[in-house]
Amino acid sequence: MRAGRCAAALLLLLLSGAGRAIGSEDIVVGCGGFVKSDVEINYSLIEIKLYTKHGTLKYQTDCAPNNGYFMIPLYDKGDFILKIEPPLGWSFEPTNVELRVDGVSDICTKGGDINFLFTGFSVNGKVLSKGQPLGPAGVQVSLRSTGADSKIQSTVTQPGGKFAFFKVLPGDYEILATHPTWALKEASTTVRVTNSNANAAGPLIVAGYNVSGSVRSDGEPMKGVKFLLFSSLVNKEDVLGCNVSPVSGFQPPDESLVYLCYAVSKEDGSFSFYSLPSGGYTVVPFYRGERITFDVAPSRLDFTVEHDSLRIEPVFHVMGFSVTGRVLNGPDGEGVPEAVVTLNNQIKVKTKADGSFRLENITTGTYTIHAQKEHLYFEMVTIKIAPNTPQLADLIATGFSICGQIAIVRSPDTIKQMSKYRVVLSSQDKDKALLTVDSDAHGSFCFKAKPGAYKVQVVVPEAETRAGLMLKPQVFPLTVTNRPVMDVAFVQFLASVSGKVSCLDTCGDLLVTLQSLSRQGEKRSLQLSGKVNSMTFTFDKVLPGRYKISIMHEDWCWRNKSLEVEVLEDDVSAVEFRQTGYMLRCALSHAITLEFHQDGNGPENVGIYNLSRGVNRFCLSKPGVYKVTPRSCHRFEQAFYTYDTSSPSILTLTAIRHHVLGTIITDKMMDVTVTIKSSIDSEPALVLGPLKSAQELRREQQLAEIETRRQEREKNGKEEGEEGRARPPGQEMVDELQGPFSYDFSYWARSGEKITVTPSSKELLFYPPSMEATVSGESCPGKLIEIHGKAGLFLEGQIHPELEGVEIVISEKGASSPLITVFTDDKGAYSVGPLHSDLEYTVNSQKEGYVLTAVEGTVGDFKAYALAGVSFEIKAEDDQPLPGVLLSLSGGVFRSNLLTQDNGILTFSNLSPGQYYFKPMMKEFRFEPSSQMIEVQEGQNLRITITGFRTAYSCYGTVSSLNGEPEQGVAVEAVGQKDCSIYGEDTVTDEEGKFRLRGLLPGCMYHVQLKAEGNDHIERALPHHRVIEVGNNDVDDVNIIVFRQINQFDLSGNVITSSEYLSTLWVKLYKSESLDNPIQTVSLGQSLFFHFPPLLRDGENYVVLLDTTLPRSQYDYVLPQVSFTAVGYHKHITLVFSPTRKLPEQDIAQGSYIALPLTLLLLLAGYNHDKLIPLLLQLTSRLQGVRALGQAASDSSGPEDMKRQTKKQKTRRT
């Protein structure tokens, strides 16, 4: 059975194990799951292994052969890696799973599955070089299903040509090889994958590899050099893409070489051989000019093609005459006579009548050639002249002159005529300017242009354009072939504008204006007058530009009250103003349709306007009084309004209610009632219904129409005759009613009103049960409500054979809790309903002692099977019951993992008939049988005996502190010694400090010690390790004492100073990043020693500062400071404080400095007493103020001064 079809919940009991009960160590956590595959695989070849995160194997097991189920017991918490180890080439996802088993939230403790999905086998093959045992790297190889176009996988070959595809499921496949440059002889093969890895049916073959090189002469590439290929090992038939014909004039240098083919160098000097098989070759260059054969170096080159493309090195070089040419006026054109040809700006020759010229004494090299001729233009050409180029390429004229004239007849009055204009040359099919020139003072201009179709335009300045200056033509098209164009001309243009006015009645007096849109202030008017309904007008001598033509009469409606015309290159005519009616203005609160007709007139005067919100203007075709009726989804203050064209005013319409539409759609025609509740208290609840569906109303209309026609036939029966009266009335039939059925309703709501619509029916369920809608009133609400009603759903089913009391659970699909629970009757039947028909439901059944499965092809029917049972008796080799054994039983969709109790017996009941696989597991024991497949029949009870044999033993002990307190969470390990050095076990102490190391092999010596990692809180252990020898019994009382890390740092120090200063001293402790706030302060009192309270051993940086209350006005001193890091356990520091008392003469000295400038000022006062006396008094006052401030600052020095010193001095670290 395929494990991919297995899906059931894992039943895992966490019970205490056998032997000594020492707490959580004996708790068994089972980590299990499935190896799943959608194809048949041999599960017995797959192993599941459990490793520690350091790579130590903890446990391994195989899979159930029937469904791939596996189970691994865990006796310790910690970090593990669960790996699947299948045969080489088999692929699974994932390949390993990292586990962090904490006994609470991990996947094993929660009973979750850990599944490995088989993704396929491997397919291996080779790509070989033709005739070789190896092949190339870098060939693209793809795998696709036979007959399919899309590839499944692709890879590239490795050195030697090997390739492999992984994750390939059974089937028939094609393997195809491709390479962008190499030719493939065998590009495809096949492979069939069944139930194991597969090899390609045959190798893929590369026919050959491309080989290339290059040839130059004086650093320039050479074309036309032949390269002949020879080989004594490769057959000519195996070489592809090469000219095999013999080369005329070539003599082979070595008769032992076999000629294969040749290649010729291209324009860039490169040559290549398309496909050469692996092997040794010789290439010989051969180059003959028009009359001479040149030497090429090297003259011969041997090379070997292996399994890759090859670039031949070194580059071949051609080692060591008059030339002629022509100058033409175009491709295949005529020769240009008297043209000057210059070579490297030094040698000059003139062309003959046919345009030909000759250059003498030219050596191989690169030259610059240029031709010159009036009104013809040539590009400078750089060419390589070599013996193989005796005839130079033609020098072809690339451009010709285009010349013309601009003629201004009269300049506009508002501007001054310019002396020159800009002229633009552009391509006829593009507007982008190619060339731009300025005309001279006489209006002449010239361009230089290549052959082609062009257009010439004169750029008139914007000021002159606004003034009305225009040249004609605007665009001068021309074609340059092989000679200059000299007849381009532009002249000024003036125009006239004319039109007519059409009135509904007599026109009377009208005013028509012509105003320039491009020139401010230019405006002309024409006064029209007449008793006719049509008049004409004309404006003459109009300068080019944009104009606005307007007609003045505000109370009339015009088709166009004003028109914009643009005078370009022609006169403007056919301008028409036509009166359309009389103006009506209307102010609306909402966009509506307005229907009106004229009182006293027939229906032909009815008009309809679609108007927008705000003030609208529209025209009435005739004068008089009109009745105006609004038609919209809004209800207004009046049902209709009147308007008189003889008394024009703004007609105002304001909406007070808005039409809300709704629909109830049902799949069945039923009674439907709608209740509408308003958020406005003054509006009562409105009950509509029972409603009639649109289908019912349409049917009633059809019946009414049939009845009307029947009555008409009876009325006219006498005229129709007896035959007509005898026509049966049943010939006309109404349409049958078919769902879905629509029940429409409406409601007139106020602006901002919120309504709640609730439908009701006896047999329908509505979705949603009710709807709310808020009417803004800004626009037509339209259909705001749409509710669907559906008939209730009834679920019915039957148990086969008939079985009473089966629990039927109905749940909504995806819901976590059941919806309805019922039991079958004595006939085994049940019925549930009505339910919401638009929801999906799941129907489950259960009954103790039975397996119930859904009957295929039915919904709600189940088939019942009586369950079977299996009992396992697990004993030790001394026939005593063996508790604590984890027994895994799996089969089909069932699996269970249980621990044996003190009696060693496990019973599995309620099993479905089928095959089951069991496996007993317990560390330190092996079992017979170790695993087995069993067949369980329906209703059968089996009894199976299993014997366990002890193969390893345990070590028990405790970890405690020096005072005997247990240490929890300490990692302990047993490390094998000597011949057992590859073995090891580890565990973690429980809350009582106890540990159990399982799986210690008899005859081995172990060191029991603390693990290096995971014990950061432990400083050391006593002893460092305990030595044990394992015999045929468990090892007890292996106890270890541990010492925790001390996290305290002691700080002490002393001060060297005179005892008279001790009472003024304080020692302050700061963190180095915060020198403004001390964290601790101690006073020395009468002692030279100090001690701070213990600090944390946190590795932080600290600063110790000495502070004093001695006034700086009387003492000079430096406050010492020491910085340190809280590393280790203790720090002692020494501070030196040596103050000195200031002398009184210092004050006199300060006064002498002040007296000197005072004396000088007094001497100057005799000369400038009127100016210096006020200045002297001011200076004296300021100096005294400065002195007083200095004295005050000296007296108040202390901690602040200490901080300044701290910033100045470098910190002394100890």
From Swiss-Prot:
Q: What GO molecular function annotation could you give as one example from this UniProt entry?
A: carbohydrate binding
Organism, scientific name: Mus musculus (Mouse)
- Residue intervals on the Cytoplasmic side: 1168-1214
Enumerate the Extracellular topological stretches. Answer: 24-1150
Residues annotated as glycosylated are N42, N210, N610
State the function annotated in the UniProt record: Component of the multi-pass translocon (MPT) complex that mediates insertion of multi-pass membrane proteins into the lipid bilayer of membranes. The MPT complex takes over after the SEC61 complex: following membrane insertion of the first few transmembrane segments of proteins by the SEC61 complex, the MPT complex occludes the lateral gate of the SEC61 complex to promote insertion of subsequent transmembrane regions.
Q: List the disulfide bonds.
A: none
Which residues are in coiled coils? Answer: 692-720
TM spans (from-to): 1151-1167
For biological process, the GO terms are: multi-pass transmembrane protein insertion into ER membrane
Q: PANTHER family, alphabetically?
A: BOS COMPLEX SUBUNIT NOMO1-RELATED (PTHR23303:SF14), CARBOXYPEPTIDASE REGULATORY REGION-CONTAINING (PTHR23303)
Chain positions with Phosphoserine modification: S1196, S1197
Could you give the subunit structure recorded for this chain?
Answer: Component of the back of Sec61 (BOS) complex, composed of NCLN/Nicalin, NOMO (NOMO1, NOMO2 or NOMO3) and TMEM147. The BOS complex is part of the multi-pass translocon (MPT) complex, composed of three subcomplexes, the GEL complex (composed of RAB5IF/OPTI and TMCO1), the BOS complex (composed of NCLN/Nicalin, NOMO and TMEM147) and the PAT complex (composed of WDR83OS/Asterix and CCDC47). The MPT complex associates with the SEC61 complex.
- Spans annotated as Disordered: 708-733, 1190-1214
- The protein's name is BOS complex subunit NOMO1
Q: Its GO CC terms?
A: endoplasmic reticulum membrane; multi-pass translocon complex
Sequence ranges of Basic and acidic residues compositional bias: 708-726
Q: Where is the composition biased (Basic residues)?
A: 1205-1214
State the annotated membrane topology for this chain: Single-pass type I membrane protein
Q: Where is this protein localized, as stated in its record?
A: Endoplasmic reticulum membrane
Q: Which UniProt keywords apply?
A: Coiled coil, Endoplasmic reticulum, Glycoprotein, Membrane, Phosphoprotein, Signal, Transmembrane, Transmembrane helix
Signal peptide region: 1-23
